[in-house]
Amino acid sequence: MGLYPLIWLSLAACTAWGYPSSPPVVNTVKGKVLGKYVNLEGFTQPVAVFLGVPFAKPPLGSLRFAPPQPAEPWSFVKNTTSYPPMCSQDAVGGQVLSELFTNRKENIPLQFSEDCLYLNIYTPADLTKNSRLPVMVWIHGGGLVVGGASTYDGLALSAHENVVVVTIQYRLGIWGFFSTGDEHSRGNWGHLDQVAALRWVQDNIANFGGNPGSVTIFGESAGGFSVSVLVLSPLAKNLFHRAISESGVSLTAALITTDVKPIAGLVATLSGCKTTTSAVMVHCLRQKTEDELLETSLKLNLFKLDLLGNPKESYPFLPTVIDGVVLPKAPEEILAEKSFSTVPYIVGINKQEFGWIIPTLMGYPLAEGKLDQKTANSLLWKSYPTLKISENMIPVVAEKYLGGTDDLTKKKDLFQDLMADVVFGVPSVIVSRSHRDAGASTYMYEFEYRPSFVSAMRPKAVIGDHGDEIFSVFGSPFLKDGASEEETNLSKMVMKFWANFARNGNPNGGGLPHWPEYDQKEGYLKIGASTQAAQRLKDKEVSFWAELRAKESAQRPSHREHVEL
């Protein structure tokens, strides 16, 4: 056959279908990793995918309730082609959230483990060249208690926008946020994991075709909250250059606390540990198996509305703590002092954040579609752990939101608006204003669209529910079947906005509706079937809540309780 035909054959093998002839192998600081090439329909250049790349040592044994340590080096080529286990969590809750939020066609089989500090990488770069593509690091949501990286497939965003997408995991629940409020277990382990993942990106992403000098962190819900915490944290300074918080910011009262003792005591007691001292609790909890801690976790009834107990003694979240390390002070103090990373920042909310998914998961009794004033008042008080509204202010709040109508269906809708404003809308505007006032480029959006991929159980009237923008951000119409042209175009536009922002710190670009910067005029973008600029998002609501919180503070005895908004 001669030599030349053989060379031509091997070249043909390289270039047919755009696949290189052998799977990608990349050097990391700790050792080589083997990935796989995946093609997206309509693209000749495949995306190299690496799944389950370790960014820290497994946080087991004495490393439980301890800062993450660097991974041990390896001398072989590590196979990183299968999904890593998600961090320990309630398997049912994790499964439900993953199925509701995934942009994939098929649900991936879920596994859970305390050994979970892994990330996934999607890179469209030609790995033989020294590409320096923008990097987008995704932090998943799930109330800091459930969720995982692999629910979100970065393939479409990576291929369409020529960016490196990294999805990271971090410890959750007891494992991620158990705190005694002192040196024995400071807490915020999950946030320290996020910082460790960003450090790993700085040290390694160049070999995957990414630019460590252009890293955007983005996340949704507790992921958006985490992004907002990292913007405020001195530990994350210079580890990223732009940030996007979708439906969650550092002033989300439910997810942050100064008062950790009662939660620590509850976790210890439910685990059969003595609570005599912090050291005793931590030592005992470190001896528990993963399954035993999971049992404790299930008893905590995390992310559930407690309709029976005293709202002031109900702890449906294992929150971030003001620990003096990740957060030197309370977020509102850091914001007021303007002592944070003034990177370009996109902050957004969805039109109906409390539309269906959150009330359903938390067990709010709203299914019959009606709500009277008395029940609304009771639900608001039962929601104290989430809203932090003092009991004597509840009638004022209920009257303001629900008082204008006798229609019980309308009252239910207004109650959902109230919940959305307190948890998402008002904190998002306050954070955006603080960011703007510190001199950082800031952009706001409100997302209003009903994806075709959502659960059939969801009422038709819910448009722009919590999490709905994820389908657009991660290009679901290019991975799942059945999207209309309108939905496909919406996803193209949103991916373009997000990636332009990752590239330039500004979402605007050719062929896109103009997105005004959030300045003193408070222009923002309404994103949906028709996308257009508007002004002063939640302006009246922010004023109402600011007045209410001021009254609350004035009435409170001198013992200061941590208050948001």
Swiss-Prot record:
Give the protein's biological function: Major lipase in white adipose tissue. Involved in the metabolism of xenobiotics and of natural substrates. Hydrolyzes triacylglycerols and monoacylglycerols, with a preference for monoacylglycerols. The susceptibility of the substrate increases with decreasing acyl chain length of the fatty acid moiety. Catalyzes the synthesis of fatty acid ethyl esters. Hydrolyzes retinyl esters.
Molecular functions per Gene Ontology: all-trans-retinyl-palmitate hydrolase, all-trans-retinol forming activity; carboxylesterase activity; carboxylic ester hydrolase activity; fatty-acyl-ethyl-ester synthase activity; sterol ester esterase activity; triacylglycerol lipase activity
What EC number(s) are associated with this protein in UniProt? 3.1.1.1, 3.1.1.67
Per UniProt, the keywords (alphabetical) are:
Cytoplasm, Disulfide bond, Endoplasmic reticulum, Glycoprotein, Hydrolase, Lipid degradation, Lipid droplet, Lipid metabolism, Microsome, Serine esterase, Signal
Assembly and partners are described as: Homotrimer.
Q: Which SUPFAM superfamilies match?
A: alpha/beta-Hydrolases
Q: Which residues are glycosylated?
A: 79, 489
The disulfides recorded in the entry are: 87-116, 273-284
The name this protein carries in UniProt is Carboxylesterase 1D
> What triggers its expression?
By di-(2-ethylhexyl) phthalate.
Q: Does the keyword Secreted apply?
A: no
- Species: Mus musculus
**InterPro entries tied to this protein:** AB_hydrolase_fold, CarbesteraseB, Carboxylesterase_B_AS, Carboxylesterase_B_CS, Type-B_Carboxylest/Lipase
Q: Where is this motif: Prevents secretion from ER?
A: 562-565
Residues modified as N6-succinyllysine are: 382
Q: Which residues form the active site?
A: 221, 353, 466
What GO biological process terms are annotated to this protein in UniProt?
A: acyl-CoA metabolic process; acylglycerol catabolic process; cellular response to cold; circadian temperature homeostasis; cold-induced thermogenesis; cytosolic lipolysis; lipid catabolic process; positive regulation of transcription by RNA polymerase II
State its location(s).
Endoplasmic reticulum lumen; Cytoplasm, Cytosol; Lipid droplet; Microsome
UniProt note on tissues of expression: Highest expression occurs in liver with lower levels in adipose tissue, kidney, heart, intestine, lung, testis and thymus.
Family (UniProt) = Belongs to the type-B carboxylesterase/lipase family.
The main enzyme category here is hydrolase
What is the annotated signal peptide range for this record? 1-18
Gene Ontology CC annotations of this record:
cytosol; endoplasmic reticulum; endoplasmic reticulum lumen; lipid droplet
